[in-house]
């Protein structure tokens, strides 16, 4: 089905670059250039921040790049948002795109317009006359253009450009580069803590005697409020409005704070609740592909505080997820330090078979890439099969980059991209400019022309014709199950020991049935019964083909007299208002409604755990039993405990299959042999009887999806709704903290901060707070969903007069460190080896042997001034780019995490918070070394940061006499400088305050 090969990219001894903070020193800060000057020794690490403030010069800004049409662009909408609120301070944004002294001014070239005139100037890659460029992956060419555009031999040197040009050699050597994205995108779960940090940083800068207004984004920042909605109401015509009203009731304080931030900080656009999902809005509207700033052209690029920011890669825009602390630094002019990545070339051939969806393809690709190993790498797709994939199909694959572990899943711009830009309302002139620029700069793929062979780190190949219908689960996105094998796989999961593919249900209990009464009618639940069926998530609701496919399945089922059982919690949460428009035009929305798939809101719901409560009768039937109910959703993640506390089995599926499983009422079914229901005349109805043909879907999509829908949806996107407009936000540079607030609280990170960095911290005789196995996710570390009534966070809230109905979710309270510290490691499905396999958010306090909540145990250690560490297995911190998964452990007093391997973003977040990430040597882990977690650990690091090297060996000793060697996972000199300062944000504050 697919082929793997290793390319001839040459290997050499790893040589770490030592560039910290090529901080911009020109009169205006660069939009997308790396900016860090070399740090060769401790003097530079400790002193460079004194000159760093030059990069944080607040720039006045010009109008944001327009889509070119008369409808509202991000620029005009930002202006509307400011003009509609009296307290808003008007400003102009300037995009500084060129360094004052430029090493590559000779290749600055004019891009002519057809018929005369020019679009503007750009740095021409072909003008370098370097044959290596033609072999570079397209994703790497974006990094190259950025380095060239900003090269002045101070911010970025010719040596940096050479590293990227020589990618075939340097990509194997852990070479460090700096990168500045053109913009930053946030959602509210991560955006609120970002604003809390920025507000707190203003206080810290003021306390150090400097001007707090220096803390201001220097690049465009878009914050889309999409994570706060919960499915409290479903299966009713007014569900969306009721959920929106309850969302505002729960989050009034947070939303008021966000509204304050939109006026207090320059360069920030807040998209109000009820507008859509951040990544779908980014894809359909915010994505530029190419910036045209005052006649200067350069590629769009973006980082976001959500791991699925990668969805924009499907549009040919370089984008990936980062932690909130990295995003904050990027906003403030700090370069992103990254290791120049390897790029896996993934060739697609053939075409998808009849009945196979883009969801089936992405689940297949996820499994292949997860097996291949792509952590820390770019994946670039190419081949003749690309012409068979719509832009929405590509975006679906790019969206799930975090699930297959890659930094990006990149699709270079081609004709399909241009057609999508036109479909979504970008003007013809804008699309023409984008095509002209990318063709001129060797960044456009034309499959009608002979293809230049590009070099990749390794190669994969997939014949699209081999992809078959499938779902993934029950606990991980990459555990793909062919649909034809699902029944057998389900029974194997019941049999298997507890694990990612097992529930250990005794044979004699596998046929257990729980009978109950639902609205006075008899009902029953057994293992595999579907209790949640959700068409949700930007992964699939951005794709008209699968959405129309789901509606057609619902219509055909209704026509045959089939109906979803009333106790199944069905929901439809589109990622943008456009979905509602084309479902209405197609006439198929009514069919979804008949099957219970009413629109419940426009945002992230079931996919992130905002699924709401089950019906009390259903919940009571499950509670106190060993029944394993199932959820089926069209999302991108199904980690245990994420979707809903009572659905222990969670499967990812295409929207049409979500409808099919809802009709069947169980995952314990063989769709080939067993019916999904019975007609009124007693005849069986099979999945094949309701499944639409590809041609049928394509015809409806062509008729129903129109450019005018995108224009009308986005031209008023910042106008919000009456609930948003009624919010009254203060107007002030500094935020007035309310000590009694349980949503917004001043964090303790910068209190008693001194002007000089503290240097490395000793980790001596530390206790093990937690001992984990493999695949501990950020959901385990810092859950986003419900606050359990017996948790430390619940006790904290109740002590402050908050009743359980108003707890809201952990995600909604990320602006309050006191709640979030108590919520760290509070996932009810967490497994801690110190408790010998017992499941739950507890641990053993080693000195006393007491079983305590993780928070209470950590508090005891902190009170006694005893350090703590964490032991972990492979893939520690996988999942969402959740900065609280690093902030929380810091507040609990964790000094180091020793793991077999780390997920990319989480490792970076740990480094950004000053927690030491350490990796066991290959073939070793806590178990092979005989570590139980009851030992005390000392990490032997030099006391001067100048004596520490990125990636060096570090010896760890225990009080039992055992010692072992780990690899220090501070990967760059930049991260060592952050560690020296106690984290990235203290580094930035000292940089600004040193003036």
UniProtKB/Swiss-Prot annotation:
Which reactions appear under catalytic activity for this entry? citrate = D-threo-isocitrate
Cofactor mode of binding and number, as noted: Binds 1 [4Fe-4S] cluster per subunit.
Q: What is its EC number?
A: 4.2.1.3
What is the annotated role of this protein in its UniProt record? Catalyzes the isomerization of citrate to isocitrate via cis-aconitate. Contributes to oxidative stress tolerance. Involved in acetate assimilation.
Q: Which residues bind substrate?
A: 187, 306-308, 637, 642, 800, 881-882
**Any idea which residues the transit peptide spans?**
1-83
The cross-references to Gene3D superfamilies, in alphabetical order and at most eight, read:
6.10.190.10, Aconitase, domain 3 (3.30.499.10), Aconitase, domain 4 (3.20.19.10)
Q: What induces it?
A: Slight level decrease after 3 days of iron starvation.
An example of a Gene Ontology BP annotation on this entry?
Answer: response to iron ion starvation
Q: Name one GO cellular component term.
A: chloroplast
Which keywords label this protein? Answer: 4Fe-4S, Glyoxylate bypass, Iron, Iron-sulfur, Lyase, Metal-binding, Mitochondrion, Transit peptide, Tricarboxylic acid cycle
Recorded family membership:
Belongs to the aconitase/IPM isomerase family.
Pathway the protein takes part in? Carbohydrate metabolism; tricarboxylic acid cycle; isocitrate from oxaloacetate: step 2/2
Q: Which Pfam families is this protein grouped with?
A: Aconitase (PF00330), Aconitase_C (PF00694)
**Phenotype of the disruptant?**
Reduced mitochondrial aconitase (ACO) activity by 20 percent. Increased tolerance to oxidative stress mediated by paraquat, a superoxide-generating agent. Altered acetate assimilation leading to lower levels of CO(2), CHO and SO, and higher OAs (organic acids) accumulation, especially fumarate.
Expression by tissue: Mostly expressed in roots, leaves and flowers, also present in stems, and, at low levels, in seeds.
Which major enzyme category is it? lyase
Q: Which cofactor does it need?
A: [4Fe-4S] cluster
Subunit organization: Monomer.
Name the record gives this protein:
Aconitate hydratase 2, mitochondrial
Cite the GO molecular-function annotations of the record. 4 iron, 4 sulfur cluster binding; aconitate hydratase activity; copper ion binding
Q: List the disulfide bonds.
A: none
Where in the cell is the protein located? Mitochondrion
């Amino acid at each position: 089905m697919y082929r793997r090969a290793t390319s001839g990219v040459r290997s050499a001894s790893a040589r770490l670059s030592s560039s910290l903070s090529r901080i911009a020193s020109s009169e205006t800060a660069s939009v997308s250039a790396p900016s860090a000057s070399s740090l060769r020794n401790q003097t530079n690490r400790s002193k460079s921040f004194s000159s760093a403030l030059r990069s944080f010069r607040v720039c006045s800004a010009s109008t944001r790049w327009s889509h070119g049409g008369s409808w509202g662009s991000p620029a005009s909408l930002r202006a509307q948002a400011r003009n509609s609120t009296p307290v808003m301070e008007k400003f102009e944004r300037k995009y500084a795109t060129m360094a004052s002294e430029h090493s590559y001014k000779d290749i600055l070239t004019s891009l002519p317009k057809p018929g005369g005139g020019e679009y503007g100037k750009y740095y021409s890659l072909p003008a370098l006359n370097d044959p290596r460029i033609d072999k570079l992956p397209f994703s790497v060419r974006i990094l190259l253009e950025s380095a060239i555009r900003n090269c002045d031999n101070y911010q970025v040197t010719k040596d940096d450009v050479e590293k990227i040009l020589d990618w075939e050699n340097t990509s194997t050597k852990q070479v460090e580069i700096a990168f500045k994205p053109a913009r930053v995108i946030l959602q509210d779960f991560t955006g609120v803590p970002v604003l809390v940090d920025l507000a707190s940083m203003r206080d810290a800068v003021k306390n150090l005697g400097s001007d707090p207004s220096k803390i201001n984004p220097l690049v465009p920042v878009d914050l889309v409020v999409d994570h706060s909605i919960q499915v409290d109401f479903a299966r009713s015509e007014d569900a969306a409005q009721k959920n929106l009203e309850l969302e505002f009731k729960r989050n009034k304080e947070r939303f008021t704070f966000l509204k304050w931030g939109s006026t207090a900080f320059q360069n920030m656009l807040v998209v109000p609740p009820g507008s859509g999902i951040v990544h779908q809005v980014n894809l359909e509207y915010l994505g530029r592909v190419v910036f045209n700033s005052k006649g200067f052209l350069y590629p769009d690029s973006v980082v976001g505080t959500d791991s699925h920011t990668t969805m924009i890669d499907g549009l040919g825009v370089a984008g990936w997820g980062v932690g909130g602390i990295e995003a904050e630094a990027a906003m403030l002019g700090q370069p992103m330090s990254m290791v120049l990545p390897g790029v896996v070339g993934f060739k697609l051939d053939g075409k998808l078979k009849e009945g196979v969806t883009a969801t089936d393809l992405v689940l297949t690709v996820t499994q292949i890439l997860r097996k291949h190993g792509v952590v820390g790498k770019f994946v670039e797709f190419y081949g003749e099969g690309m012409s068979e994939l719509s832009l929405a199909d590509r975006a679906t694959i790019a969206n799930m980059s975090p699930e297959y572990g890659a930094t990006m899943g990149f699709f270079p711009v081609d004709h399909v991209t241009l057609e999508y830009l036109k479909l979504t309302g970008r003007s013809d002139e804008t699309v023409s400019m984008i095509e002209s620029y990318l063709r001129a700069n060797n960044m456009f793929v034309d499959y009608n022309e002979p293809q230049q062979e590009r070099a990749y780190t390794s190669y994969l190949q997939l014949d699209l014709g081999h992809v078959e219908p499938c779902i993934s689960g029950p606990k991980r996105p990459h555990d793909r199950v062919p649909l034809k094998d699902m029944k057998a796989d389900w029974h194997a999961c019941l049999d298997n020991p507890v694990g990612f593919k097992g529930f250990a249900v005794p044979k004699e209990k596998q046929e257990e049935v729980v009978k109950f009464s639902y609205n006075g009618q008899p009902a029953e639940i057994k293992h595999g019964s579907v209790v949640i069926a959700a068409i949700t998530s930007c992964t699939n609701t951005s794709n008209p083909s699968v959405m129309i496919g789901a509606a057609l399945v619902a219509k055909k089922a209704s026509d045959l007299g089939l109906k979803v059982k009333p106790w199944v919690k069905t929901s439809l949460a589109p990622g943008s208002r456009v979905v509602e428009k084309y479902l209405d035009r197609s006439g198929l929305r009514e069919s979804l409604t008949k099957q219970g798939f009413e629109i419940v809101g426009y945002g992230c719901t079931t996919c992130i755990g905002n699924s709401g409560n089950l019906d009390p009768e259903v919940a009571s039937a499950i509670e106190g039993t060993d029944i394993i109910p199932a959820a089926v959703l069209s999302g991108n993640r199904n980690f245990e405990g994420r979707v809903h506390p009572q659905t222990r089995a969670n499967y990812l599926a295409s929207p049409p299959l979500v409808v099919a499983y809802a009709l069947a009422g169980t995952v314990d079914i063989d769709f080939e042999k067993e019916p999904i229901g019975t007609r009124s005349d007693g005849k069986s109805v099979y999945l094949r009887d309701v499944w639409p043909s590809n041609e049928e879907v394509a015809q409806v999509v062509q008729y129903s999806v129109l450019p005018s829908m995108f224009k009308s949806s986005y031209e008023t996107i910042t106008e919000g709704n009456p609930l948003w407009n009624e919010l009254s936000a203060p107007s002030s540079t500094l935020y007035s903290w309310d000590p009694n607030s349980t949503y917004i609280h001043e964090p303790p990170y910068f209190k008693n901060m001194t002007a000089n960095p503290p240097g490395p911290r000793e980790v001596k005789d530390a206790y093990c707070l937690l001992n984990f196995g493999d695949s501990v996710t950020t959901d385990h570390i810092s859950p986003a969903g419900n606050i359990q009534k017996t948790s430390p966070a619940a006790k904290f809230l109740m002590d402050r007069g908050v009743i359980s109905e108003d707890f809201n979710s952990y995600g909604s309270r990320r602006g309050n460190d006191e709640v979030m510290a108590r919520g760290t490691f509070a996932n009810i499905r967490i497994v801690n080896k110190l408790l010998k396999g017992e499941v739950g958010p507890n641990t053993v306090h080693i000195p006393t042997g007491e079983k305590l909540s993780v928070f209470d145990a950590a508090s005891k250690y902190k009170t006694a001034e005893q350090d703590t560490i964490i032991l972990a297995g492979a893939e520690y911190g996988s999942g969402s780019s959740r900065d609280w998964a690093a902030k929380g452990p810091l507040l609990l007093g964790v000094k180091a995490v020793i793991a077999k391997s780390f997920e990319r973003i989480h490792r970076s977040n740990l480094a950004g918070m000053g927690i030491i990430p350490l990796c066991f040597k290959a073939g070793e882990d806590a178990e092979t070394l005989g570590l139980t977690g009851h030992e005390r650990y000392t990490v032997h690091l030099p006391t001067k940061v100048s004596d520490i090297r990125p990636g060096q060996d570090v010896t760890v000793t225990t009080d039992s006499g055992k010692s072992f060697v780990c690899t220090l996972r501070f990967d760059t000199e930049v991260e060592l400088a952050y560690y020296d300062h106690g984290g990235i944000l203290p580094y930035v504050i000292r940089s600004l305050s040193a003036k």
